[in-house]
């Protein structure tokens, strides 16, 4: 039964047919094993108009009974992130996706409670400052995979370039267990990149896109 339920996404699992079929199916839906991966992105179109993803997220976290290992958040997740931080001590993977609205204060409080975190993805989450990565480096010593995509601005259809800023690179260089790193639209320059490489001896995969302050000799970085 659990094998079948694993094939459903979170919204279908909680508010779809399985939870209403019979008592045994209802009980199975509440099994913590099914809630090790919680996804707030609301992929089930047929439920999006009637289901509060915020309520679903907190209920999913409750069902996980401390067993949640992976969490996907989108849009305003301040309350959900704090709720997760208090109830997911085993979390290993955190994804805050696409214009995710989370304050620096909330993120700082939450990240301190994820000491086992191995993967962090921040995609167009611009409400936290770069200093937060120093906190990540300290709070998550086992972090192995980091992806940070900035929401790059534009003016009259011309992409704006970021001024040189290596503060994020200096913090990332303290994440000594990193295996993969993806940085898009960052302000680091060659010196910042060198600092990361020197500080992350286990780095196996590096993906740096649209970081126009990095100059590769013999290559036009803007072309």
Residue ranges and their predicted role:
Residues 1-223:
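The conserved beta-strand core of Leucine-Rich Repeat
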């Amino acid at each position: 039964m659990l094998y079948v339920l694993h094939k459903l996404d979170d919204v279908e699992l909680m508010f779809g047919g399985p939870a209403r079929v019979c008592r045994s199916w209802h009980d199975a839906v509440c099994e913590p094993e099914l809630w090790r991966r919680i996804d707030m992105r609301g992929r089930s179109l047929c439920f999006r108009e009637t289901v509060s993803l915020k309520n679903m997220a907190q209920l999913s976290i409750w069902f996980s009974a401390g067993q949640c290992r992976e969490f996907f958040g989108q849009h305003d997740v301040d309350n959900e992130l704090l709720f997760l931080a208090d109830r997911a001590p085993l979390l290993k993977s955190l994804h805050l996706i696409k214009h995710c609205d989370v304050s620096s204060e909330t993120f700082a409080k939450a990240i301190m409670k994820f000491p086992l975190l191995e993967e962090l993805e921040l995609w167009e989450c611009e409400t936290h400052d770069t200093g937060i990565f120093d906190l990540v480096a300290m709070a998550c010593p086992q972090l192995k995979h980091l992806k940070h995509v900035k929401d790059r601005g534009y003016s009259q259809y011309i992409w704006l370039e970021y001024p040189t800023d290596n503060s994020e690179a200096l913090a990332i260089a303290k994440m000594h267990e990193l295996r993969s790193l993806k940085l898009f639209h960052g302000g680091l320059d060659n010196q910042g990149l060198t600092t990361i490489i020197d500080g992350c001896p286990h780095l196996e995969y590096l993906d740096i896109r649209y970081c126009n302050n990095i100059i590769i000799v013999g290559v036009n970085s803007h072309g």
